[in-house]
Amino acid sequence: MAEKFLIASGKGGVGKSTIASFLARESAQKGHKVLLIDADPGLGALDIMLGVQERVMNTWLDIVTDNCESENALIEVAENLSLLPSPSVYPEDITAEDFSNVVAYFDDKFDMIFIDASAGIDKNLEITASAAER
């Protein structure tokens, strides 16, 4: 079972995504199999930060809406490090259970899952926090 970490902040622009990507990369370099989830719809930029934006074909929203197989949304960034990109918009009908189910699917496939949440304290944070342990 993967350890699940939420990286969150009440304010944007404070380096949350930088910290999330650093923790994920360092953990992967130490031999842990790591999944980094960009949970910042509309403003997510981990794909750009990690230099894989040209390879984004699907997002975690495509998994929720059954538009792709779960593995088809993952992007291998480096050895032991995969990214699950964020959708460009956050649909209002997504629930904490929907997001938690996506994370749960990958639970036994990774050692660590880092969730980069959107800025602010709102419904989106509640949804993503429900899938994390720390």
Model regions and ranges:
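N-terminal regions of ATP-driven nucleic-acid and macromolecular assemblies
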Residues: 1-4, 129
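Walker A/P-loop NTP-binding active-site region of P-loop NTPases
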Residues: 4-67
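Alpha-helical segments flanking ligand/cofactor-binding loops in enzyme cores
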Residues: 25, 104, 126-127
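P-loop/Walker-type NTP enzyme "switch/lid" segment
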Residues: 39-108
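Glycine-rich phosphate-binding loop used to anchor ATP phosphates in small-molecule kinases
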Residues: 107-124
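Inter-motif core of Ras-like GTPase G domains
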Residues: 122-134
